[in-house]
């Protein structure tokens, strides 16, 4: 479980997040949407302890972490997996070693045990047999999936995704969405996805939260968000519908897998 209570975040006297209250239960996938600069990625940074709030509480399971020091935070982070916007793979390590990195850093497992886990996590994300590939041999979508395999290697209770479909074409984005959904079925736990991609949000989320100018202005199921009478929400969804129509009119002819 993740729970944020009365969170306020200020930078240089500018309020970035204002009175944020949200809970994500175990087994739930929540998508956080909103325009650029609305505070979405700041929320992720708060959840993982990279930023401290100006006020409020951050609960990870039964621990309130908002004032934790780095050593205590590192223990909490072992419960989390993070999938970054640009994959953040180590270019000098193979796919297998990228996935194994956290296991080597934070466990005392044997090399044989680590290799077995690496193979299993690559199977989960649909990259069987890619252990010896280098990152520069992979497409953008494959890099995202390696990043996800690395994130779930330590069997986290929480997975945080920062723009997992950024820079991908619609069909590759749909493949990433499917991977996220399959991973959630296998791992369970909590998934929080920050995204601009409304098609992804509607596909993967049990619940959607929209942030605008640092405040939660809408929250609910995908159906509730689609039917919201909030003008800002409808404008955001309307932009998505226009893009979706454009994609249908101009089909993607070449896909890199």
Please tell me what each predicted stretch does.
Residues 33-35:
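The feature captures the beta-strand-to-loop junction immediately N-terminal to the Walker
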Residues 48:
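Helix-to-loop junction immediately C-terminal to a conserved catalytic motif
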Residues 64, 111-129:
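Conserved ABC ATPase "signature" region
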Residues 134-138, 142:
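Conserved ABC ATPase signature
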Residues 153-157:
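A short, proline-enriched helix->beta-strand linker immediately N-terminal to the Walker B motif
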Residues 159-162:
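Catalytic Walker B motif of ABC-type/P-loop ATPase nucleotide-binding domains
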């Amino acid at each position: 479980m993740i729970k944020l209570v009365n969170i306020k975040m200020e930078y240089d006297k500018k309020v970035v997040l204002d009175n944020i209250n949200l809970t994500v239960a175990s087994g739930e996938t929540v998508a956080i949407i909103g325009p650029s600069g609305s505070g979405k990625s700041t929320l992720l940074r708060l959840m993982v302890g990279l930023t401290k709030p100006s006020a409020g509480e951050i609960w990870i399971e039964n621990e309130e972490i908002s004032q934790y020091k780095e050593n205590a935070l590192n223990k909490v982070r072992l419960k989390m997996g993070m999938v970054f916007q640009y994959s953040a793979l180590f270019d000098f390590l193979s796919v297998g070693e990228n996935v194994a990195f956290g296991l080597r850093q934070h466990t005392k497992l044997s090399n044989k045990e680590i290799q077995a886990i690496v193979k299993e996590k690559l199977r989960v994300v649909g990259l069987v047999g890619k252990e010896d590939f280098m990152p520069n041999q992979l497409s953008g979508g494959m890099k995202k999936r390696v990043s996800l395999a690395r994130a779930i290697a330590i069997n986290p209770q929480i997975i945080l995704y920062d723009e997992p479909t950024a820079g991908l074409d619609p069909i590759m984005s749909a493949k990433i969405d499917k991977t996220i959904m399959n991973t959630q079925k296998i791992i369970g736990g909590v998934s929080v996805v920050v995204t601009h991609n409304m098609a992804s949000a509607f596909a993967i989320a049990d619940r959607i939260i929209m942030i605008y100018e640092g405040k939660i202005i809408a929250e609910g199921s995908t159906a509730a968000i689609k039917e919201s009478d909030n003008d800002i929400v409808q404008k955001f969804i309307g932009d998505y519908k226009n893009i979706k129509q454009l994609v249908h009119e101009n089909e993607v002819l070449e896909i890199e897998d």
